[in-house]
C-alpha cells in the first residue's frame, strides 16, 4: 500500500492560470495540467535561483521529492511548448500555510495547515467558513474567499 501524498508548501499563486498557443482555435487545443506545486518548484529553482536543498526546505519535502516535482513540471512545460498545447495551472497536493479561515458561526479564525481546502470549522464543525485574508494573497485560489 502506497503512503499518502504529503502536502507541499506553496507561497506563490499566479494571477493567470491558463495559457494557450496563439492562433489555434480553443476547440483544437489539447491541454497539459501543471499542478500548483510544480509551478512553485520551477519558481523557486529557476526564478529565485535557490539550490535544491533550499527549495526542498521551502516546500517542506525531501530533496528527492523536490527533484521529482520539478522534473515533472519541466517535462509538462516542454511538451506543451513543443507540441502546441495549452497549459492549465490547477490542482495538486499543496498547502499555503498563509490563508486564514473564519467561521461565520463561532467566529473562530484558523490557518489552513494540513489541507488546501477546509470544508468545516475545526472548533464547531460548521460549513459556513470564509477566507479572512485582508491582503488578497490567495485571490481566487482559496475556497470561500471574501472579495
Swiss-Prot record:
Cross-referenced InterPro entries: UPF0251
Domain of life: Bacteria
Family membership: Belongs to the UPF0251 family.
Protein name from the UniProt record: UPF0251 protein CTC_01373
Organism: Clostridium tetani (strain Massachusetts / E88)
Lineage: Bacteria, Bacillati, Bacillota, Clostridia, Eubacteriales
